[in-house]
Amino acid sequence: MTEINFRNAQFLISAPSLRECPAEEGAEVAFAGRSNAGKSSAINCLTNNGKLARTSKTPGRTQLINFFSLGQGAQQRLVDLPGYGYAKVPLATKREWQAHLSEYLYKRKCLRGLVLLMDIRHPMQEFDTMMLNWAVDANMPVHLLLTKSDKLKRGAANNTLLQVNRSLKESGVQDLVSAQIFSSLKNVGVQQLEQVITGWLNLPAGEDEASVKN
């Protein structure tokens, strides 16, 4: 397995739709979540670059599909998808974002996995479930990142993780979906996230993690 130095990450391009995305070459992992779930902060924490992905206290500022290369040739990429569900924008705009997200998940052939971020205090909201269902329907590996774990005591955070994993097992998707606790503020869970993404980016084209395990 090829090791990845996430600190080499650099901004590549912003795309308003799938047509403007980089060429279907190499492999990429996407980050998705509600507008206040901490996507940009997680990417900045993972890459140890506080200025890589734009962060804002105003939810919904990420309205484009933002790509970051992880090395020369941009053959491995991280993707920051538009936040959903919380942003105070017109309904028509929300629907347009949802259409772009759905199109990206179903049609982007070089996408190897989806990191789905949820505030650990409010996991599995309506839009989270919608995104998870889209990914599962597309047979896309998903890693749930329960963010802002520093807002809870360790026992409460672990209990939430246990409940989420139980829900995944009851839904029968545990082979395709995993979960972990994460805090960009305290650097909790960074190494585990690195391992998951590295594994995905090393998957051969056309294979998912479940098929490799089997």
Swiss-Prot record:
Its cofactor is Mg(2+). GTP binds at residues 33-40, 60-64, 80-83, 147-150, 182-184. Coiled coil: none annotated. One of its GO terms (cellular component) is cytosol. The keyword Nucleotide-binding applies. Keywords: Cell cycle, Cell division, GTP-binding, Magnesium, Metal-binding, Nucleotide-binding, Septation. Necessary for normal cell division and for the maintenance of normal septation. This is Probable GTP-binding protein EngB. The lineage of its organism: Bacteria, Pseudomonadati, Pseudomonadota, Gammaproteobacteria, Cellvibrionales. The gene is engB.
